[in-house]
């Protein structure tokens, strides 16, 4: 119990940064949609990585790690969280990717925007920002989801890059955020054969993790990274939660793992191969 109280206290303490919230549903958006980058070839599977790069502070190291992964297994879509525009542009340039980046707030302590991004070897259409319910009482910060239609392998995929609230918010409110993501995915699923939802759901404790997974499963989304194990580390490695997930419709997972030798964040990149 004492460890639990300490963890919650530390999370609350470090989540009270001064932020300016971007409340407009249609701005600011940053995107690159270069047709010459896009891979028009058909394929039987999609390689995906979700990765929270901790306020985009170690971008050069993250890019080096991504390039090392690309040499072994080319990645078609990256879902990134805690990003700023400079970090997204550097990754896109370094790996030859198109991107959609939607900041949700300006972090006054870092003097940079922070938000979620989708990067891909395909093209991205129909960008949207889904603002999630409930503001954090400490600083009135809101969370949002970056959504776009990725066209790759002659397929159209509705893609979500998600970052929901920490335990600084009540469990019920955090589940409301999860419900909002699922509801939007359900509404749009009729227009898409393939839906991909991934990111950092801040499920620091197993009971809450089970609740999140059950919500997605009961609404027809498969947890494609169920066998990956821990995806993050905290308190000098004493706590190793499952925070990062890939859920989908229309795919079958053939391989998934966390890259635990990564040193560019307190989260591990989570990789999955999804067969169409």
Q: How would you describe each model-predicted region?
A:
Residues 164-181, 203-217:
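Active-site-proximal segments of metal-dependent phosphoesterases and phosphodiesterases across multiple
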Residues 58-62, 83, 140-142, 172-180, ...:
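Soluble or luminal CAZymes and related metallo-dependent hydrolases
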Residues 3, 14-94, 106-110:
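N-terminal, active-site-proximal structural segment of metallo-dependent hydrolase catalytic domains
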Residues 46-52, 66-91, 119, 148, ...:
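Active-site beta-strand/loop signature of hydrolases that rely on acidic residues for catalysis
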Residues 21-33, 79-158, 162, 258-261:
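Structured beta-strand-rich core segments of catalytic domains in phosphoester-bond hydrolases
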Residues 17-36, 186-195, 203-276:
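Metal-dependent phosphoester-hydrolase catalytic domains
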Residues 60-66, 101-104, 134-135, 229-234:
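N-terminal post-signal-peptidase region of extra-cytosolic proteins
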Residues 2-8:
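Sec-dependent signal peptide recognition
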């Amino acid at each position: 119990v004492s460890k639990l109280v300490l963890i919650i206290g530390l999370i609350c303490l470090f989540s009270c940064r001064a932020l300016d919230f971007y409340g407009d549903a249609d701005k600011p958006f940053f995107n690159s949609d270069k047709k010459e980058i896009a891979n028009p070839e058909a394929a039987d599977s999609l390689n995906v990585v979700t990765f929270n790069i901790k306020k985009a502070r170690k971008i050069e190291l993250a890019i080096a790690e991504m390039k090392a992964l690309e040499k072994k297994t080319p990645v078609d879509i990256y879902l990134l969280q805690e990003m700023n525009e400079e970090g997204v542009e550097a990754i896109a340039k370094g790996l030859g990717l198109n991107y959609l980046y939607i900041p949700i707030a300006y972090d006054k302590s870092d003097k940079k925007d922070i938000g979620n991004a989708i990067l891909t070897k395909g093209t991205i259409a129909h960008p949207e920002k889904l603002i999630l319910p409930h503001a954090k009482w400490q600083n009135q910060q809101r969370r949002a989801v970056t959504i776009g239609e990725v066209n790759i392998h002659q397929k159209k995929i509705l893609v979500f890059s998600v970052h929901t609230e920490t335990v600084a918010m009540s469990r019920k409110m955090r589940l409301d955020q999860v419900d909002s993501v699922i509801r939007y995915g359900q509404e749009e699923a009729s227009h898409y054969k393939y839906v991909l939802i991934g990111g950092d759901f801040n499920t620091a404790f197993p009971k809450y993790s089970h609740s999140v997974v059950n919500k997605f499963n009961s609404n027809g989304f498969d947890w494609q990274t169920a066998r990956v194990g821990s995806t993050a580390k905290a308190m000098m490695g004493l706590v190793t939660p499952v925070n990062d997930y890939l859920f989908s419709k229309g795919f079958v997972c053939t391989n998934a793992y966390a890259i635990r030798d990564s040193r560019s964040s307190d989260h591990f990149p989570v990789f999955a191969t999804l067969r169409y």
